[in-house]
C-alpha cells in the first residue's frame, strides 16, 4: 500500500507471531474448551450481554479471529462461521484445535481491510479484541458492511477509549492519569511494536454511520468481582477495571 499501511500490517503480523508463541497458542486450548462464549480480558459471559442473538443457521464472518475460539463457539451453537486472520501462526493454532477437538469451519488468511468474501454473504460479522484495534476503521468498517446482508449485525469488542488514554507508551498497565490527548489515541504506534486504532465514541459513531451502520448498543465492560489480573496482556488491572470500563462492545446493524 502506497500510504504506508502495508508496513503497519507487516509490523502487526510480526508482533502476533511472537504473541502466539508466547501466549495465544497455549491459551487457545482452554478457550476452545469453554462451554459458552465470553468477552474480553475478564471473560464476561455472553449470556449476561446477549449481543450475538440466536446464531443457529446464520452465516458468520469472524474478522481478525486470532486462534478462532469465537468461531468455535459459534459453530458449536449451530452457526456457519468463516474465520479470517492475517496471522499464519494463529491460524495454525486454530487448525490444530480443529483437528484435536473440533468443530471444523473454514480458516482463511486474509486482511480484514480487503476481505476475500462476496458481497452480502453473511448475517453476522463479529470480532473479539481483533479487528477494531488492529485495522484501520475507515477501511474495515466499509468491508464489514459490504459482506453483510441488509439488516445484518456487526458485533465487535475493543479496548475502551479511556484505557487507551491511560496506558503508558513504553510498558505497564493503565493508571489513574491521562497520558495522551483525546484525539492522540485514534492511531497509536507502540514502542514495543504494533500499530493500534482507538477512536473515541464520537469517532466510532461517525465511522459506523459513514459505512452504512445504525448503532444499536454500546456496552462498557467492567471486570466482574473476584479473580486476578489477566495472565498475559498488560492493559489494565482487575482493580482498575472495576472502577473504569476496560473494554467497549459495540453492536450495529447494516442499514
How should these model regions be labeled?
Residues 113-124:
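A short acidic, Gly/Pro-enriched loop at the edge of an enzyme's catalytic core
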Residues 29-58:
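Conserved alpha-helix/loop element of class I SAM-dependent methyltransferases that forms part
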Residues 124-138:
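A short SAM/SAH-binding and catalytic strip from SAM-dependent methyltransferases
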Residues 1-30:
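N-terminal, positively charged/glycine-rich alpha-helical extensions of SAM-dependent methyltransferases
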Residues 59-114:
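Class I SAM-dependent methyltransferase SAM/SAH-binding core
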Residues 195-218:
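Short alpha-helix
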Residues 138-153:
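A short glycine-rich, Lys/Arg-flanked "PGG" loop and its adjoining helix->strand segment in the class I
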Residues 153-186:
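Conserved class I S-adenosyl-L-methionine
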Amino acid at each position: 500500500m502506497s500510504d504506508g499501511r502495508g508496513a503497519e500490517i507487516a509490523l502487526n503480523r510480526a508482533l502476533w507471531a511472537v504473541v502466539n508463541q508466547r501466549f495465544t497458542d497455549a491459551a487457545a486450548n482452554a478457550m476452545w474448551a469453554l462451554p459458552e462464549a465470553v468477552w474480553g480480558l475478564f471473560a464476561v459471559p455472553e449470556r449476561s450481554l446477549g449481543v450475538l442473538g440466536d446464531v443457529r443457521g446464520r452465516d458468520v464472518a469472524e474478522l481478525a479471529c486470532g486462534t478462532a475460539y469465537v468461531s468455535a463457539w459459534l459453530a458449536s451453537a449451530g452457526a456457519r462461521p468463516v474465520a479470517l486472520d492475517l496471522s499464519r501462526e494463529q491460524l495454525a493454532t486454530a487448525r490444530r484445535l480443529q483437528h484435536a477437538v473440533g468443530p471444523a469451519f473454514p480458516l482463511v488468511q486474509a486482511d480484514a481491510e480487503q476481505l476475500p468474501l462476496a458481497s452480502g454473504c453473511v448475517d453476522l460479522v463479529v470480532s473479539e479484541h481483533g479487528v477494531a484495534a488492529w485495522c484501520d476503521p475507515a477501511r474495515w468498517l466499509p468491508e464489514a458492511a459490504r459482506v453483510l446482508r441488509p439488516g445484518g449485525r456487526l458485533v465487535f469488542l475493543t479496548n475502551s477509549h479511556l484505557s487507551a488514554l491511560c496506558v503508558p507508551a513504553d510498558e505497564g498497565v493503565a493508571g489513574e492519569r491521562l497520558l495522551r490527548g483525546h484525539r492522540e489515541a485514534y492511531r497509536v504506534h507502540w514502542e514495543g511494536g504494533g500499530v493500534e486504532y482507538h477512536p473515541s465514541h464520537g469517532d466510532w459513531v461517525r465511522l459506523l454511520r459513514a459505512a452504512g451502520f445504525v448503532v444499536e448498543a454500546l456496552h462498557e465492560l467492567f471486570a466482574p468481582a473476584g479473580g486476578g489480573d489477566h495472565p498475559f496482556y498488560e492493559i489494565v488491572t482487575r482493580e482498575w477495571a472495576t472502577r473504569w470500563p476496560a473494554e467497549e462492545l459495540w453492536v450495529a446493524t447494516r442499514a
